[in-house]
Amino acid sequence: MGKNVVVLGTQWGDEGKGKIVDLLTEKVSQVARFQGGHNAGHTLVIEGKKTVLHLIPSGILHDGVTCMIGNGVVLSPEALIKEIEELEANGVEVRSKLKLSPACPLILPYHVALDLARESKRGDAKIGTTGRGIGPAYEDKVSRRGLRLGDLLNEQRFAAKLAEVLEYHNFALTQYYGAEPVDYQEVLNKALELGAQLRPMIADVVDMLHTSRENGEHILFEGAQGSLLDIDHGTYPFVTSSNTTAGGTATGSGFGPLYLDYVLGITKAYTTRVGSGPFPTELECDVGKHLGEKGHEFGATTGRQRRTGWFDAVAVRHAVRINSMTGMCLTKLDVLDGLSEVKICVGYKDSNGAVIGIPCDAEGWADVQPVYESMPGWTASTVGAKTMEELPVEAVNYIRRLEELVGIPADIISTGPDRVETIVLRHPFEG
């Protein structure tokens, strides 16, 4: 009997999902992306070699694994072809193993132009998007005017739809944002050229997933970003434009929720965030600087320096609930090595001292003050540990306390960037 496992981030992204997906892929026949676009970066380190993926599932580095991009992913043909060519230049076979849903909404140059124009107009109130057209592409999908990958299979139909939607967006670009219009013919020619390369990879992803399930094969669903960036459950409006939570797995792939066996929450041992938005436990001091430098906290997609802070158990417990998580994988434990004291946010209070729960808007988040619990740190190194017995007792106590606070066990603990630097207490595909 096969198992179907979802891997998600429990924080604001950058939790280390890429390494864990790569580790788990050894057991599966298929890996599927179900939301987001090329705004997310998945960094893998295998035998010392670093690979950064943005659209293609991390399982592409494994032989015999089919990688799928489901209908919930907004797809930039240009970004995808570039990523394919980069992998091929490094000797990785991609095209025969990658399958694309024809229902994927397309990201085209006018989406990028809109994204950049909006952020520029917002000024200091900007959301902090990656400027890659993700939000505008999802807007087109919801408004039912968006072009989809399957439209490229009929060039005349694609050209007609493009003319209509580009007229709409060029009006906004020129008349509201004061930006330059996007050239129709350039967009059309480039899209058709790239579409010809993508056409052989277009497949019925829904049917392929269910055929694998019926054949008793293991399937892994790879989430992007993190639960606190979810369009509905995140720190709105400082969120992404898709459902990054477990519910998005079903809608973004066509794989029913009752078929999912295990939801693994990837959880950093401290907290980071890229760009604007609420961050109750942020540290603007030497400890925060230490976490950023030791953790190499720079975005895989944008290169922007990440903000750093203590572990927020309130936020992670919220993520556990909305995802019905089975267990967590604790990553970057080694970054806390050398600290004499570690703190955990165990509650929120407002400016009047009243205990509060998870706010529902930016104004509510602005009033949040963290309530901390302190624990002894550890000086011994945790780097490369493969068993709990190799960890300092203080590190073990820290892990156990996090388990108590968020309500799920730490089934996997990552002690370094390489896949072998991992403690596996309960394997999602074996337990």
Curated annotation (Swiss-Prot):
<dbReference type="InterPro" id="IPR027417">
    <property type="entry name" value="P-loop_NTPase"/>
</dbReference>
<dbReference type="InterPro" id="IPR042110">
    <property type="entry name" value="Adenylosuccinate_synth_dom2"/>
</dbReference>
<keyword id="KW-0342">GTP-binding</keyword>
<feature type="binding site">
    <location>
        <begin position="41"/>
        <end position="43"/>
    </location>
    <ligand>
        <name>GTP</name>
    </ligand>
</feature>
<feature type="binding site">
    <location>
        <position position="306"/>
    </location>
    <ligand>
        <name>GTP</name>
    </ligand>
</feature>
<feature type="binding site" description="in other chain">
    <location>
        <position position="225"/>
    </location>
    <ligand>
        <name>IMP</name>
    </ligand>
</feature>
<keyword id="KW-0547">Nucleotide-binding</keyword>
<feature type="binding site">
    <location>
        <begin position="300"/>
        <end position="306"/>
    </location>
    <ligand>
        <name>substrate</name>
    </ligand>
</feature>
<dbReference type="InterPro" id="IPR042109">
    <property type="entry name" value="Adenylosuccinate_synth_dom1"/>
</dbReference>
<comment type="similarity">
    <text>Belongs to the adenylosuccinate synthetase family.</text>
</comment>
<dbReference type="GO" id="GO:0004019">
    <property type="term" value="F:adenylosuccinate synthase activity"/>
</dbReference>
<dbReference type="GO" id="GO:0000287">
    <property type="term" value="F:magnesium ion binding"/>
</dbReference>
<feature type="binding site" description="in other chain">
    <location>
        <position position="240"/>
    </location>
    <ligand>
        <name>IMP</name>
    </ligand>
</feature>
<feature type="binding site" description="in other chain">
    <location>
        <position position="130"/>
    </location>
    <ligand>
        <name>IMP</name>
    </ligand>
</feature>
<feature type="binding site">
    <location>
        <position position="144"/>
    </location>
    <ligand>
        <name>IMP</name>
    </ligand>
</feature>
<comment type="subunit">
    <text>Homodimer.</text>
</comment>
<dbReference type="GO" id="GO:0005525">
    <property type="term" value="F:GTP binding"/>
</dbReference>
<feature type="binding site">
    <location>
        <position position="41"/>
    </location>
    <ligand>
        <name>Mg(2+)</name>
    </ligand>
</feature>
<dbReference type="InterPro" id="IPR001114">
    <property type="entry name" value="Adenylosuccinate_synthetase"/>
</dbReference>
<dbReference type="Pfam" id="PF00709">
    <property type="entry name" value="Adenylsucc_synt"/>
</dbReference>
<dbReference type="InterPro" id="IPR018220">
    <property type="entry name" value="Adenylosuccin_syn_GTP-bd"/>
</dbReference>
<feature type="binding site">
    <location>
        <begin position="414"/>
        <end position="416"/>
    </location>
    <ligand>
        <name>GTP</name>
    </ligand>
</feature>
<dbReference type="GO" id="GO:0005737">
    <property type="term" value="C:cytoplasm"/>
</dbReference>
<dbReference type="GO" id="GO:0046040">
    <property type="term" value="P:IMP metabolic process"/>
</dbReference>
<keyword id="KW-0658">Purine biosynthesis</keyword>
<comment type="pathway">
    <text>Purine metabolism; AMP biosynthesis via de novo pathway; AMP from IMP: step 1/2.</text>
</comment>
<feature type="binding site" description="in other chain">
    <location>
        <begin position="14"/>
        <end position="17"/>
    </location>
    <ligand>
        <name>IMP</name>
    </ligand>
</feature>
<feature type="binding site">
    <location>
        <begin position="332"/>
        <end position="334"/>
    </location>
    <ligand>
        <name>GTP</name>
    </ligand>
</feature>
<feature type="active site" description="Proton acceptor">
    <location>
        <position position="14"/>
    </location>
</feature>
<comment type="function">
    <text>Plays an important role in the de novo pathway of purine nucleotide biosynthesis. Catalyzes the first committed step in the biosynthesis of AMP from IMP.</text>
</comment>
<keyword id="KW-0436">Ligase</keyword>
<keyword id="KW-0963">Cytoplasm</keyword>
<feature type="binding site">
    <location>
        <position position="14"/>
    </location>
    <ligand>
        <name>Mg(2+)</name>
    </ligand>
</feature>
<feature type="binding site" description="in other chain">
    <location>
        <position position="304"/>
    </location>
    <ligand>
        <name>IMP</name>
    </ligand>
</feature>
<dbReference type="GO" id="GO:0044208">
    <property type="term" value="P:'de novo' AMP biosynthetic process"/>
</dbReference>
<feature type="binding site">
    <location>
        <begin position="13"/>
        <end position="19"/>
    </location>
    <ligand>
        <name>GTP</name>
    </ligand>
</feature>
<feature type="active site" description="Proton donor">
    <location>
        <position position="42"/>
    </location>
</feature>
<keyword id="KW-0479">Metal-binding</keyword>
<dbReference type="InterPro" id="IPR033128">
    <property type="entry name" value="Adenylosuccin_syn_Lys_AS"/>
</dbReference>
<keyword id="KW-0460">Magnesium</keyword>
<feature type="binding site" description="in other chain">
    <location>
        <begin position="39"/>
        <end position="42"/>
    </location>
    <ligand>
        <name>IMP</name>
    </ligand>
</feature>
<dbReference type="InterPro" id="IPR042111">
    <property type="entry name" value="Adenylosuccinate_synth_dom3"/>
</dbReference>
